[in-house]
Amino acid sequence: MESLDSMLTDPLELGPCVESNGTGIMEECMLGGTRVSLPEDLLEDPDLFFEVVSRDTWKNVLSDSQREHLKQFLPVFPDDNANQQEKIIQSLFRGDNFRFGNPLHIAQKLFRDGHFNPEVVKYRQLCLKSQYKRYLTSQQQYFHKLLKQILASRKELLDLARKNGPDQVLKKKPSSLRNTPEERETRAQCRYLKILREVKDECGDGTLSSEEEDLSSWLPESPTHCPSVAVPLRVIPTLSTQDMKTADKQEFTNHDLKLLLRRHREKRKRQSDHPDLITDNLSMNDIMTRVNAGRKGSLAALFDLATMKKRVKEKDDKKKKKLKTIKTEVEDYPDMPDEADIMPAVLPPETPQVTLTAVKEEPLEDVKPPLPFNEISACFFCLLLDILTMEGPCSLPLLEDKVSDWQSLPASTLNSWFSVAPNWCDLVHPALIYLSGECKVASSSFTPFVEFREKTQQWKCVVSSSDSEKELVAHFHLWLETKDQIYSKENEDCIDASTPIPRVRTDYIVRPSSGEEKHVFQEQERHRYIQPHKAFTFRMHGFESVVGPVKGVFDKETSLNKAREHSLLRSDRPAYVTILSLVRDAAARLPNGEGTRAEICELLKDSQFLAPDVTSAQVNTVVSGALDRLHYEKDPCVKYDIGRKLWIYLHRDRSEEEFERIHQAQAAAAKAKKALQQKPKPPTKMKSGSKECSLKLCGTPEPAQLSLTESSMPPTPGTPGTPTPPALPSTPMSPSTSATVNKIVASTITETQKSSQSVLLVSSPAMPQLSTLLSPAVTSQSTSVTPTSGRAATISSSTGVPQVRIVTATTGVPTTQSAAVVTQPLSPVISHIRLPVTTTPTKALAQTQVVTVPVKNQTTIGASRLGASVTTQGSVTVNTLNSSAGLASKSVVSSPGASGPAILQSITGQSIIKQVALSGQLGVKSQPSSSLPLSSTNFRIQGKDVLRLPPSSITTDAKGQTILRITPDMMATLAKSQVTAVKLSQELFSAAPVSTTGKGLLHVTSSPSSPSPPAPSTIKLTPEMKPAETSSSSFRLMPALGISVAEQKGKVVTAGESKPATTIRIVQGLGVMPPKVSATQSITVSAKPVTVPSSTIVNPVHSASNVSLPTVNSTAVKTAPTGIVVGTGAATVRQIPVTTTQQGKLPARITVPLSVLSQPMKGKGVVTAPIIKGNLGANISGLGRNIILTTVPAGTKLIAGNKPVSFLTAQQLQQLQQQGQATQVRIQTVPASHLPQGTSPASSKAVSTVVVTTTPTTKPTQEPQ
């Protein structure tokens, strides 16, 4: 046995079947108690098995000792044993039959069927063991029963011998009949039927009654019946469960049918509740469908197909039948003289021989069985549905045969529509296409009557013809009228969409490429992608394949961007090499332009841009998705043929010139589309990087002036992206004017917005135009504005002294009073920003102001035409007309001792932010004649370093506080930039208790008209309050910026000049806070007196002057104020909102920015600080480019995206929220009682506010930019 084990485990026995790398699939087999691993192919493939187990292996592979060991298992012969064993071995390998088959063939079948599997062997042994136990048990029972019978018989014989003696003959007793009720009933039935049959035979009656038929089912088979002819069993070898089914069908006779019916009646009589007998919900169609469904894929379907072919042959044979003569010959019977001699009397007398003549065989008429469907139908569609209903799902050829059989019947001509078409067989397929709803003429409401099954290639009826006969007739007449047009159109479409003929025919079959072939292809591929914008021709394997240019590449200049990462492609490839382009090239290289997906994968593997460690499964998956994408392109290059299961390259008939012509057309279309999508850019740019208006200089710099009238305002609400150029009215100009402004561009579009999907920008409907203008060399004369132009502002300049005039139109007040003018030296060129603002009208005064603010540029501005560079410096001069007696004046006074003028400074560089913000009166309707509709207006001119905050960083807590979360990365980014934010404390607005009445009166006073500079005037906002309550507070800036805080009254503290210049930006609108101002605020600028109207935010930038922001107690105006003085070393940008309140209206919210940049960092946590306290108002802005929300009037439009948009309604806000453009934006109605103290209007009406809320995140998103 040890030698057998070594032989079975010897590698020589397996031969070439075992792969050297061990990747072959092995199967374990149990041979004689030894577990052996054999290749699966060896066991499954008979040819391979007999190649291994062969005579050659016996002679050349096995050793002599192994052969001698195996010969021991052969039978031993007494004579000539060696030769006999050799003959047996030869017969064994030849496949001779050893009476019960060849042992090698039997072994191969056992190997193939898995009988040597260890598990099978185990269970077979257990089964044999169980059968042996059962056998032993049955043997025990048999012998036990036999023993009892023997003992009983022995006793009986002994008793008989003892009684009768030896001479008595033994009489065997017959076995007792079983008297069970079933046996008695059976005998009675048989006896009854026997008597009944004998009576009927005597009477000659052959009919049977129903009772007799039921009784006849008990009749046993008569022994006189001839045994039926045995049907040969032709078993088709297969692995299915139908191995034992007969191949030939048994024909049922009438006798068999009667027996079947009798058994069915008996079954119904005895088992009425059997499931097979419940036929309440069954119909004939269901039965036919169930019967036909069983034939699919079975052997019966194969034989039905063979029977159908035989019928077709029989039809052809019948057509070829001719008259045939039957040749008969006279048969000569052999003489039997012996018998004639023996019995002469028995033989009849001889009769003359009759010669049989030839008889003509007349062809019998073909008697066709009646069709299962009605031959007369309402229309052709009904006929087709009847055929499908009776036959079940049918293929197109079978339907055409059925229609042909129907057309050959005489009854078919009785249909009124029969003569419409000469051959209805040709119209079967078009009619089915129409009934399935796939026809192009069919309407969208068309209900299909049939459907086509792609898998089985069969048509199935889905609607019964009897249920919709009228509808079918109407469709039939419509189809007859339009079928010719449909066919012509479909034929043209088929011609256009037909598979193109390949340019070069080839018999090449795709196979793995050799190293040389792969090298040749990669070289061609390299040349192909050197010029991706041109077509290329691959020349491989004796044929050419033309591919078009790479889609989206229209010029030779390649992109410097890095290619997108792909798991299958190399990272160092060109950016335009994608998996789609490579699959397109592989499909183009298919031989004859068609092939399978596996062939495309094989061609793709030759590409040099594939990663080296890519597997075939990954390539197959990616190619599958790429082919689907190519299949659904606008101009698809591939399509899938379902019938042949091949991918077809549709562009194989195109030439390189045709490809390039189409590509050039696509390039032109893409260029035109891109030009339409681009926005109009400003004509010129500042060198500083801020997109502003450039100037058109001619000759020497001379003065220029601009007037902004009402016509410059947009008449209807619109987006800032569509600015309206302001008109230039005729105003007095200096004689030396030689430079004019040529273009005015809205400031809201000067900054290109960066794309951000998490940004919602909403701006006001009334967008006043902001323009940056340059003023040439100034003259010594000043011009004024006619008082009637209440909505205009002019710049009147003298030599080095520009002026900004604020014209206030009042009702009932003469406007002839002179204006206070302050002049300052100015450089030859100046830039201005014009800001129209609106004040709250009182009962006696309605004011409209337009402020023109000059902008100083620290760097040189290059003129586009002259090439000269000039340096500008300017000042602000605001004049106020005396309104009426008894009104308080408001002014901003600049000190003559200041070291520099007060200017709005424009700083160059990529990290500079310029911001101009306007704030108006909320809840106050502007006067149509004298005021500008500037309610809640936000304008922003920003640089490129605006921090983009994600929505998750802006949250609102349960108390209504808006929380701004800034990550350490954001703080580090801002700390490096030149822009530094400042924290504005709330103490400025809590100096005194707020009036309980909620009223605020604005007192306007003006200085007497005189050419000399008037005394400094103050802006007083005096709420009604108790005189006893006095307090003061100061405007605090963070010490980290080098700005000292004035803690004592009357003391001025300045910052050190050694500090570097820092731009402090107080961003408007991070939150809204109700005004708690309880003292008169005065803004004093150390310069000549200028007057600033109320409801205006002035953004002065102090270059070298001091700004004092004191708060004055309303009851003690003469008290020395406390303030903050910004030193000359720090350039600040300050926004100071001054608002008024009108009874019955909601006052404007004072914008209180609050930043956390000056907060000390503790660890890596997130710095969180409240923005505001109280409810959110209608003006939320200043979060970089993130959110600007204003009040929402009805009937305005929404433009989603990252551009500033108009007002939006509550419904549009809801739509925007559903689209994911905003986190949570809602309009909230706040009752008057819930408003903070001091901000509630006199009326108890609810106020609608826009609230932006976001869900706070546990881990904020860190975005550096």
From Swiss-Prot:
It is found in: Nucleus. Residues 1239-1265 have a biased composition (Low complexity). Pfam families: NFRKB_winged (PF14465). Residues 39-156 form the DEUBAD domain. Belongs to the NFRKB family. InterPro entries: DEUBAD_dom, NFRKB, NFRKB_winged_dom, NFRKB_winged_sf. GO terms for molecular function: DNA binding. It comes from the Eukaryota. Residues 670-693, 705-738, 1000-1033, 1234-1265 are annotated as: Disordered. Its main location: nucleus. Binds to DNA. The keyword DNA-binding applies. One of its GO terms (cellular component) is Ino80 complex. Keywords: DNA-binding, Nucleus. It comes from Xenopus tropicalis (Western clawed frog). This is Nuclear factor related to kappa-B-binding protein. Residues 714-729 have a biased composition (Pro residues).
